[in-house]
Structure formats: structure tokens, C-alpha cells
């Protein structure tokens, strides 16, 4: 007789972690004191500054170069970073680094400058490294097929943010665009974590309203996604909730009176960095996956792209019985709706049930977006309807393959990502019964989209 023996894998509980830069300096005017360490503690001699042309031409690098001159540290500046940094510009900067041979790299700017500088750092220290290997997706950052090269053997990395949003100054991530394919790749490894972050709001005071708004809402999505992510812990939860409380209170002030309201700027800078530390360890989700591709295909600022997708993702993730969960979560049953309700509670938004609290959270986020001038839909930003629909399938596929998708608490189907994009374009919100999305051809109007969905829903019930 044959014995039918079935084997079931038992999941092991992995060690958790919390990683952050070795040194984080915070306070308006702290830059000169922080940079003192380069000479007095580390004995550094050559610094390479990475920034964009706007910041360079408007004197943002001067406080840094003045301090370096005072300490006798030789320096040069690369200022050709684009708003969406490309692999080509990173290679150009790395070539200049190789010629200059710095022992210190100082990234000054928003996420674009800091991300580009991280890629330059890798290419400078390890020119043999293969970019596509580094961009390879993984399930667990601690158990990768590809081992990231050891960083810091040639240069010490310092990040100085000039806006309150990306959190790149404290994260192990860098987003770079392959200019040949147009694909935006998020790289992730703790070797990319800066050695020092300097959060000096002297660099934030003159940020324009549009940047303040987009960056601030970006920080909101960082904190919300980190709180609901599969790798969230007690350590990241506190940072995420504190960041959200601070942003909801101070972002409108920073937006309206940013050039004079020092307290609002400082609070926002700290909140963005705290949200960065939260998602550096808990990771993000499908909102960022879709925002990466929406920005790459239609040239929307990253924070705006996140703002346009966040409501759809909140509704999608809140399903109590999802068809497919994310992989290797730190919990044993779906509880994302309850997590969103906890965020609503920490913001004192009210509600008697978790469902009511979710609606109040969505309403509060939408009200915050309205206060800082964020529009309601993708279409409102002038994205041509035919161009959007023509690119929709490719954008959907790339979002599905994005590294951030793997940490989302609910694993999406491509059809679900596609419908969320359509909802965000037309301002029609996610309804569970309307999944999966039906194929839509040509230049259609919102009513036609609704008719196709309703027809599909009826046929599914039949």
C-alpha cells in the first residue's frame, strides 16, 4: 500500500531590525557644527557635492562650501541632477567623482539629488557593479540573491535635505530612471543608507508652495504606508504616528507662511525624517509602486503622484477578506482596516467603527490635500486621456513589478492596479465588487468607463 504523506512548510519568525544613519543632526543652523566633524573627528580632505542646477545657481551650496573652505577641505560640485535623475547622469557624476577622488560625498537637495548621489556613490566605489543586478527585486531584504557591494570604503556619505518629504536622507533607497527604457527603478539595500543626515531648516525656508505641498503629502503617504506595511514594528509605528500628527498640524502653516514660519518648517522637516525612518524599516506599498510609474510615464512630481493614488490604495487595502495577502507579514491575519482606524484615532478624527474611522481618515487626507492645493484627479493635471489609456497597460505591468508592491499588506492583481489607476484618473473610487477591471479601448469618457464596469459586474453575478 502507498502512504500519501503531505508536507506543510512551517514559517520561521525572522529576527527584526531597526536601521538608521549613524548620525542625524537636527536644528535650524546645525550644518556648520555637523560638518566640523569632517576635519576635527574624521580628518577628511576632499568633498564632492551633488545637487541640482536650481539649488546651485541660487546659492544653496554656499553655506557648505564656505564651511569646507574654512576647514581647508578641497571641494567640487556636480549640479546636473535632473528632477527625475537618470542612470546616464549618475554615470556622469560617478566619472567626475572618479577623477576627483573624494573621501566625502555631500548630497544637497530633495529626493532627486540624494538618490542620484547614492547611485554615483555606488558606481564610484564599485564601478564593476551591474545596475540590473542591484535593481533585482527581492522578498526579504536580508535574504537576497544579489549581495550589494560594501559601501563607505572610499567615501563618507552625508545627506542634507532641502525639502520636507522624501526622507531619502535616512533611507536605504534610491530611485533612478533608465533613460533608454524609461523605466523607473527603486533600488533598496542598507548599504545605501547615508552615514550622516543633517536636518537644517535654513535650507527649507524658501521652498516654494508647490514643492512644500507635494513633499508634505509624500511624507503623509510614507507614514501611512509604513504603518500598514507587512514589516511594521513597534519601533516604526511610533515614528509613523508622530510624523502624521505633526504633518496634519504644521503642513498648512508651512504651505501658507513657509518663508517666515520657522516652527512649521522645522516641525515638517522633523516629521519627514521620522516618516523616512519608519518606511526605511517597515517599507512601503503599492501606492508608491503606482506613483513611481505614474510619475515616470506622465512626468508628475512624485509627491503629487502619491497624493493622487493614496485614497484608492486605502480603500483597496482595507478589505477584510482579500483574495491574496502579501508575503511574509509580521501578523497572522488581515488587519489593515484596524491599522487605518488606529491612524484615525491618533489624529482624533472620531468614528464608532473601523469603517467609519477609515472614511474619516480618507476625508482628512483629502481635506489636507485641498488646503495645500493638490488637485483631485490625474486628469486635473492635464494628462491627456488617450495618452493615459494608451500607456495604461504598460504602466500597470511596471507598477506590479515594482519593489514596493511586495511589502503591501494586500497583494494586488494587475487588473486591480489598472482599475485603481482608472479610478484616480476619472475621480471614481474603488468598489470591491467591480473587480477585476475590464479592458477599455480608445478615448472613452467617465460615463463609458462606468458602463463597462457595471456591465462586467452584472455578468460576474449571472
Residues covered by each model-derived region:
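Glycine/threonine-rich beta-strand-loop-alpha-helix active-site module
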Residues: 88-202
Amino acid at each position: 500500500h502507498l502512504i500519501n504523506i503531505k508536507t506543510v512548510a512551517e514559517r520561521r519568525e525572522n529576527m527584526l531590525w531597526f536601521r538608521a544613519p549613524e548620525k542625524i543632526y537636527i536644528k535650524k543652523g546645525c550644518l556648520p557644527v555637523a560638518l566640523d566633524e569632517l576635519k576635527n573627528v574624521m580628518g577628511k580632505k576632499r568633498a564632492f557635492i551633488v545637487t541640482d542646477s536650481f539649488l546651485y545657481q541660487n546659492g544653496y551650496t554656499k553655506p557648505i562650501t564656505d564651511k569646507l573652505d574654512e576647514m581647508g577641505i578641497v571641494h567640487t560640485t556636480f549640479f546636473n541632477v535632473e528632477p527625475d535623475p537618470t542612470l546616464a547622469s549618475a554615470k556622469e557624476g560617478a566619472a567626475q567623482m572618479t577623477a576627483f577622488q573624494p573621501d566625502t560625498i555631500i548630497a544637497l537637495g530633495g529626493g532627486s539629488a540624494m538618490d542620484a548621489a547614492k547611485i554615483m556613490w555606488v558606481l564610484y566605489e564599485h564601478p564593476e557593479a551591474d545596475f540590473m543586478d542591484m535593481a533585482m527585486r527581492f522578498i526579504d531584504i536580508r535574504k537576497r540573491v544579489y549581495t550589494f557591494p560594501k559601501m563607505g570604503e572610499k567615501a563618507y556619505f552625508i545627506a542634507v535635505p532641502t525639502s520636507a518629504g522624501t526622507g531619502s536622507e535616512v533611507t536605504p533607497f534610491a530611485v533612478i530612471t533608465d533613460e533608454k527604457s524609461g523605466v523607473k527603478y527603486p533600488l533598496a539595500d542598507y548599504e545605501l543608507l547615508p552615514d550622516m543626515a543633517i536636518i537644517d531648516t535654513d535650507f527649507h525656508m524658501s521652498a516654494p508652495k508647490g514643492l512644500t505641498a507635494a513633499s508634505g503629502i509624500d511624507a503623509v503617504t510614507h507614514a501611512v504606508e509604513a504603518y500598514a506595511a507587512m514589516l511594521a514594528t513597534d519601533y516604526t509605528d511610533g515614528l509613523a504616528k508622530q510624523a502624521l500628527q505633526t504633518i496634519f498640524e504644521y503642513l498648512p502653516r508651512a504651505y501658507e507662511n513657509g518663508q517666515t514660519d520657522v516652527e512649521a518648517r522645522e516641525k515638517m522637516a522633523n516629521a519627514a525624517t521620522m516618516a523616512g525612518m519608519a518606511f526605511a524599516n517597515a517599507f512601503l506599498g503599492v501606492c508608491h509602486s503606482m506613483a513611481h510609474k505614474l510619475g515616470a510615464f506622465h512626468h508628475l512630481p512624485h509627491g503629487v503622484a502619491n497624493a493622487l493614488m493614496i485614497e484608492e490604495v486605502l480603500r483597496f487595502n482595507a478589505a477584510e477578506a482579500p483574495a491574496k495577502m502579501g508575503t511574509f507579514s509580521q501578523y497572522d491575519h488581515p488587519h489593515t482596516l484596524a491599522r487605518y482606524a488606529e491612524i484615525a484615532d491618533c489624529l482624533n478624527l472620531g468614528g464608532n467603527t473601523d469603517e467609519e474611522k477609515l472614511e474619516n481618515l480618507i476625508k482628512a487626507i483629502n481635506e489636507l490635500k485641498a488646503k495645500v492645493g493638490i488637485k483631485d484627479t490625474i486628469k486635473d493635471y492635464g494628462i491627456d486621456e488617450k495618452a493615459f489609456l494608451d500607456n495604461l497597460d504598460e504602466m500597470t505591468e511596471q507598477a506590479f513589478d515594482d519593489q514596493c508592491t511586495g511589502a503591501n499588506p494586500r497583494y494586488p492583481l494587475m487588473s486591480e492596479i489598472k482599475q485603481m489607476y482608472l479610478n484616480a484618473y476619472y475621480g471614481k473610487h474603488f468598489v470591491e465588487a467591480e473587480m477585476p477591471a475590464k479592458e477599455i479601448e480608445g478615448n472613452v469618457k467617465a460615463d463609458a468607463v462606468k458602463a463597462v464596469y457595471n456591465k462586467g459586474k452584472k455578468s460576474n453575478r449571472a
